[in-house]
C-alpha cells in the first residue's frame, strides 16, 4: 500500500543533507545542516560572532572544526535569534572564548506554575518529536530529514538582554541591527547586517507551513504578530535571508518570492478564521470551510510538512476566543463514561460498533474507526479489541499525513497501545 502523505513527506523533507559551510560574503558564513538547526558565523576585526549555537555540543564541536578552517579568530560573542533548545544547545562548546551572549526579552509573560505541567509537557514533547520512534518510523522532522542525536544540550547563560523594538550594535567592527520579531517564540529577533544586506530570521520562516500551534502544547503564539514580523522581514529588502532551519534564500528577488507568499498564506488563514468566528462559526465548521486560495495552495513553502492549517485554525480560535464554541449544549457535559455507554446502547450494543469498526478499517475510513474505538474505550468495554483497532487506525493516519509532527504523534501513541 502506498501512503500518500508518507511519500510526499519523504520526497520533500526526508532526504539527509551533509553538513556544509556556505560562504555568503568574505565575512559571513552560513553553517548549514549541523544537526537540525543552522547557525551563522560573522567575522569581525579580531573575533567572531556566532548567530545561534546549534542543537547540541556534538554538532557545535563539528561546526567549530569547520570554523577553524575559515579563520583563527575566536568566537567571542553569541547572538541568539530565540531560545528554543535546538538553537542554544551547543553554546558551551565556545565557552572558553565567549564573553557575551545576547538575546531578546520575551514579548509575553510566561504563565505561572508551569512546573506543575512538567510531566505532561515531557510526554507530549516525546510524542510530537517522535523521540521513541526509529529513524525509519520518524522519517522526517518536518524541516528536513531526521538527524541522529549528537551529544548533549549545553547552552550558555545569556549575559545581555535586548528589550527594545530595535537595537543597533557594533561588535568588533561588525554592524548589527537586532529587530524584535515575535513569531514562533515571543523572544524572537532578526539579526540584520546592514552593510552586507543579510538577515538571519530565526524560526519566523522555514520551508513548511509553520507551527502556528504546536500539538505538544504551548502558550498561544500570536499569529497576528507573526505576520507583522514577516512584514518587517519583507521590508528589509535583504539580498540574503538565513533561516534557522533549511537552506539560505540567496538573491533579493528570491527572498521576496519566498517570504511574501509565506506571509500571505499565514495572514489568509488568520483573517479567514477571525471572519468565521465573527459569523458564529465553531472550530469544526472553520476547519472544514477554510482552505488556501488556489494561488497559494501549491506554494512549496506552505505545504504542511511541520504544522497544519487545521491545527492553526483551532489554535487561533482558542487564542482569541477560548474553549467555548457558543453552543450552550457545551456549557455542561456528560460524564465521558456515561455518554459512551448511552451511545453504545443507542447504536445497538458493542457488537454493532465492533462490526462498524471492522467495516471502517476495511474501507480505510480510519478517522471514523478511531472515533468509534474511543467510544468503547471510554465505556471501558472490549478494551483490548478497541485498542488493537485503534492502533491500526492511528498507524494508517500517521502514514497518510504529510505533517511530521502529526505523523510522530500518531505513531508514538499507536506504539503505546
Regions found by a protein language model. Name each.
Residues 65-164:
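Active-site HxH/HxHxD metal-binding segment of metal-dependent hydrolases
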Residues 35-37, 55-58, 83-86, 107-109, ...:
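Solvent-exposed loop/turn segments at secondary-structure junctions
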Residues 47-48, 55-57, 166-170, 175-281:
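Metallo-beta-lactamase
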Residues 1-11, 120, 147, 236-240, ...:
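Accessory terminal helices/loops
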Residues 18-71, 190-203:
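Conserved beta-strand hairpin/beta-sheet module of binuclear metal-dependent hydrolase folds
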Residues 23, 32-35, 160-163, 170-171, ...:
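A short catalytic or substrate-binding loop motif that flags glycine-/basic-rich loops and adjacent residues
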Residues 123-171, 176-179, 209-211, 221-225, ...:
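Extended catalytic-interface subdomain
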Residues 27, 42, 52, 67, ...:
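Divalent metal-coordination and catalytic microenvironments
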Amino acid at each position: 500500500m502506498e501512503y500518500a502523505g508518507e511519500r510526499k513527506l519523504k520526497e520533500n523533507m526526508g532526504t539527509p543533507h551533509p553538513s556544509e559551510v556556505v560562504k555568503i560574503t568574505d565575512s559571513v558564513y552560513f553553517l548549514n545542516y549541523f544537526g537540525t538547526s543552522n547557525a551563522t558565523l560573522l567575522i569581525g576585526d579580531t573575533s567572531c560572532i556566532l548567530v545561534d549555537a546549534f542543537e547540541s555540543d556534538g554538532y557545535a564541536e563539528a561546526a567549530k572544526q569547520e570554523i577553524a578552517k575559515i579563520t583563527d579568530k575566536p568566537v567571542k560573542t553569541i547572538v541568539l535569534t530565540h531560545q528554543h533548545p535546538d538553537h542554544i544547545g551547543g553554546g558551551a562548546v565556545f565557552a572558553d572564548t565567549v564573553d557575551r551572549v545576547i538575546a531578546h526579552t520575551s514579548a509575553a509573560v510566561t504563565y505561572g506554575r508551569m512546573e506543575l505541567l512538567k510531566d505532561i509537557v515531557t510526554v507530549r514533547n516525546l510524542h510530537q518529536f517522535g523521540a521513541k520512534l526509529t529513524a525509519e518510523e520518524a522519517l522526517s522532522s518536518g524541516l528536513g530529514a531526521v538527524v541522529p542525536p549528537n551529544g548533549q544540550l549545553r547552552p550558555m547563560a545569556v549575559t545581555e538582554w535586548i528589550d527594545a523594538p530595535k537595537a543597533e550594535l557594533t561588535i568588533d567592527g561588525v554592524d548589527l541591527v537586532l529587530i524584535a520579531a515575535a513569531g514562533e517564540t515571543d523572544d524572537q529577533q532578526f539579526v540584520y547586517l546592514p552593510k552586507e544586506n543579510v538577515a538571519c530570521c530565526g524560526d519566523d520562516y522555514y520551508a513548511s507551513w509553520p507551527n502556528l500551534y504546536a500539538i505538544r502544547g504551548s502558550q498561544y503564539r500570536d499569529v497576528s504578530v507573526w505576520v507583522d514580523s514577516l512584514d518587517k522581514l519583507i521590508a528589509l529588502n535583504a539580498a540574503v535571508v538565513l533561516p534557522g532551519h533549511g537552506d539560505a534564500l540567496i538573491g533579493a528577488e528570491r527572498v521576496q518570492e519566498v517570504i511574501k507568499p509565506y506571509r500571505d498564506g499565514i495572514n489568509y488563514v488568520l483573517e479567514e478564521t477571525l471572519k468565521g468566528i465573527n459569523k458564529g462559526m465553531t472550530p469544526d465548521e472553520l476547519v472544514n470551510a477554510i482552505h488556501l486560495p488556489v494561488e497559494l495552495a501549491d506554494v512549496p513553502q506552505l505545504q504542511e510538512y511541520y504544522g497544519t492549517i487545521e491545527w492553526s485554525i483551532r489554535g487561533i480560535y482558542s487564542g482569541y476566543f477560548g474553549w467555548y464554541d457558543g453552543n450552550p449544549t457545551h456549557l455542561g457535559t456528560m460524564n465521558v463514561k456515561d455518554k459512551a455507554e448511552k451511545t453504545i446502547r443507542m447504536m445497538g450494543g458493542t457488537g454493532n460498533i465492533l462490526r462498524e469498526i471492522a467495516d471502517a478499517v476495511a474501507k480505510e475510513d480510519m478517522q471514523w474507526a478511531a472515533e468509534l474505538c474511543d467510544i468503547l474505550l471510554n465505556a471501558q468495554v472490549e478494551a483490548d479489541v478497541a485498542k488493537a483497532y485503534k492502533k491500526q487506525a492511528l498507524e494508517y493516519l500517521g502514514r497518510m499525513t504529510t505533517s511530521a509532527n502529526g505523523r510522530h504523534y500518531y505513531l508514538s501513541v499507536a506504539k503505546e497501545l
